[in-house]
């Protein structure tokens, strides 16, 4: 299946899994924002350290604005394959189209590692 138009680069499976792990750790030891509205606000306010966007969002318009907004605000973002997995990592029982890590907590090193790898992928 073709990737949605908002997916601007391919994320290796192990890096996507690290992103989900970072969400879980930040959820427990830091602060996250769940859902596209909360994520968008966190990006606009410059609070987000890392934005995680699901690749299986339908309709695409729900999250299509996030990659360009993150680029404008110079906030790293990454894709994960499943909104269901992203919701579970965020600690909610429903799917999440996107999540923003505001305070990484104990995931600080992991978030920094992901951000550096994402910069490489975006070249």
Curated annotation (Swiss-Prot):
One Pfam entry for this protein is: Ribosomal_L7Ae
Tell me a Gene Ontology molecular-function term this record carries: rRNA binding
Q: Which Gene3D superfamilies match?
A: 3.30.1330.30
Q: Where in the cell is it found?
A: Cytoplasm
Kindly list the biological process annotations in GO that this record carries: rRNA processing; translation; tRNA 5'-leader removal
InterPro entries per UniProt: eL8/uL1-like, Ribosomal_eL30-like_sf, Ribosomal_eL8-like_CS, Ribosomal_eL8/eL30/eS12/Gad45, Ribosomal_eL8/Nhp2, Ribosomal_eL8_arc
Superkingdom to which the source organism belongs = Archaea
**UniProt keyword terms in alphabetical order:** Cytoplasm, Ribonucleoprotein, Ribosomal protein, RNA-binding, rRNA processing, rRNA-binding, tRNA processing
| A GO term from the CC aspect | ribonucleoprotein complex
Q: Which HAMAP family match?
A: Ribosomal_eL8
Q: What is the purpose of this protein?
A: Multifunctional RNA-binding protein that recognizes the K-turn motif in ribosomal RNA, the RNA component of RNase P, box H/ACA, box C/D and box C'/D' sRNAs. Component of the 70S ribosome. Component of a box C/D small ribonucleoprotein (sRNP) particle that is involved in pre-rRNA and tRNA processing. Utilizes the methyl donor S-adenosyl-L-methionine to catalyze the site-specific 2'-hydroxyl methylation of ribose moieties in rRNA and tRNA. Site specificity is provided by a guide RNA that base pairs with the substrate.
Please report which protein family the annotation says this sequence is part of.
Belongs to the eukaryotic ribosomal protein eL8 family.
Describe its partners and assembly state: May be present in up to 3 copies per 70S ribosome. Part of the 50S ribosomal subunit, where it binds 23S rRNA at its canonical site near the L1 stalk, as well as a possible second 50S binding site near helix 25 and a possible third site on the beak of the 30S subunit. Component of box C/D small ribonucleoprotein (sRNP) particles that contain rpl7ae, FlpA and nop5, plus a guide RNA. These sRNP particles form homodimers, giving rise to an asymmetric holoenzyme. Probably part of the RNase P complex.
Q: What is this protein called?
A: Large ribosomal subunit protein eL8
